[in-house]
Regions:
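Catalytic cores of the polymerase beta-like nucleotidyltransferase superfamily
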Residues: 1-415
Length: 415
């Protein structure tokens, strides 16, 4: 283990802003205080060592302290040099602090113990030790810590062995029921790191999902889902969409037979996955794409705290999809201006149009052209010009401006 400890220390000393040495100085002036590096940064260092896999420079660094997280954060801010920006955000609920230094983020957590009273709810938190803090982690590969003062490696759950074996192991038998968003994270790691989920962890995941939805309370016989759970899943998906291959992650979730954690009505086939790629290219709302074909839209929206404007987008999508399906002969002969009128008279949101594009089918090119071309074309004559030509302001002038705009749209198409 000494060679691993030497390797980790050698890499941590290279962390930006002389962070490692700043922490060592803090420990010197605060005797008996333990500070450890934990989480993804440490995991990726070990993956690099054992599998020669290179990662981009770290932008997120996680620390855990047996003491005051804010005290360490203030010490770092006071003593750090040669930085343009250093901001501190406190989160009192979990005794955590986020430091933003230029483009880097350092999360400092006071060591804590978490108890989940009900699946998917936020936990009750009490102060604890580094060893106890590691018990609340999601996977063994993320439950490794390196204490700065003693150079001690904490590996209570065989995380290093799992990294060597490229294996994803949940930490304990209640890992998924405590926080079902860990399913999404697990698929993310499988995709990003090219790791495989262990049989026991897969079995736990499948059994827990079969019990979905988890009820937090009932009001007037109407199911209320734990709001924290929906938020966490949406946040995980947003991070994946930003930094990973969402299509690959969803394929893995489907392969593991746990897709109902997102939506039991999702049919994962080539068309669906192609649309998922498109929604990312269009910079659309991936959550709405995952929910768009829900049989019980109200329940699906409730599950993921979909707001009213997003619900309107989904309802419009569903209605327009039906109209297009049952009038195919009519729409096949629509001109660009007719498509423009069809979309704009219904006041369709761009996100609705993106969902329709991602469905593919015979009309996606027309909808695509409206989204990126036709909607931006204007009439060559505005209201002031028409007034000079003798038009009176009002409804008729508006109709004329619209007619002239439609002529420009169709002219562009012909040319």
């Amino acid at each position: 283990m000494n060679d691993i400890s030497d390797y980790i220390q050698g890499e941590l000393i290279k962390t930006p802003f002389n962070l490692y040495n700043l922490i060592a100085k803090y420990i010197e002036s605060n005797k008996n205080t333990k500070v450890a590096f934990v989480g993804g940064y440490l995991r990726d260092l070990l993956i690099s060592k054992f599998h020669k896999k290179s990662f981009s420079k770290p932008v997120d660094i996680d620390l855990v302290i047996e003491g005051s997280s804010i005290s360490l954060a203030k010490f770092i801010k006071k003593n750090i040099v040669n930085v343009d920006l250093c901001l501190i955000k406190e989160f009192n609920l979990y005794n955590t602090v986020e430091i933003n230094i230029n483009d880097y983020k350092i999360d400092i957590a006071s060591a804590r113990k978490e108890i989940y009273s009900s699946p998917g709810l936020n936990p009750t938190v009490t102060k604890s030790t580094i060893e106890e803090d590691l018990k609340r982690r999601d996977f063994t590969i993320n439950s490794i810590a390196f204490e700065v003062s003693t150079r001690k490696i904490y590996d209570l759950y065989g995380g290093i062995a799992d990294i060597k074996s490229k294996r994803l192991n949940l930490l304990h038998s209640n890992s998924i029921s405590d926080d079902p968003s860990r399913l999404i994270r697990c698929a993310k790691y499988a995709s990003r790191l090219d790791f495989n989920i262990s049989n026991n962890s897969l079995k736990q995941s499948q059994e827990t999902v079969r019990q979905w939805p988890w009820k937090s309370s009932e009001t007037h016989q109407k199911m209320i889902y734990p709001p924290a759970l929906g938020i966490r899943i949406r946040m995980e998906l947003a991070e994946i969409c930003k930094h990973d291959n969402l299509t690959n992650v969803i394929s893995i979730i489907h392969k593991w037979e746990i897709i109902s954690i997102l939506n039991e009505n999702i049919k994962v086939d080539k068309r669906f996955l192609r649309g998922l790629n498109w929604i990312k290219k269009l910079k659309g709302n991936h959550m709405l794409y995952l929910l768009k074909d829900s049989e019980d839209l109200e329940k699906a929206c409730q599950r993921f705290l979909v707001n009213n404007s997003e619900i309107k987008i989904l309802e419009d999508y569903s209605n327009v999809k039906k109209i297009l399906k049952f009038n195919q002969k009519k729409f096949m002969h629509f001109s660009p201006s007719s498509w423009t009128e069809f979309i704009e008279d219904r006041n369709l949101n761009d996100e609705t149009v993106k969902l329709l594009i991602c469905d593919g089918g015979p009309y996606w090119r027309k909808l695509f052209k409206w989204l990126f071309i036709y909607k931006f074309i204007k009439s060559k004559k505005d209201g002031e010009t028409l007034k000079k030509e003798g038009w009176d302001p009002g409804k008729e002038m508006g109709k004329e401006i619209k007619r002239l705009r439609y002529l420009e749209i169709d002219k562009l198409y012909r040319n």
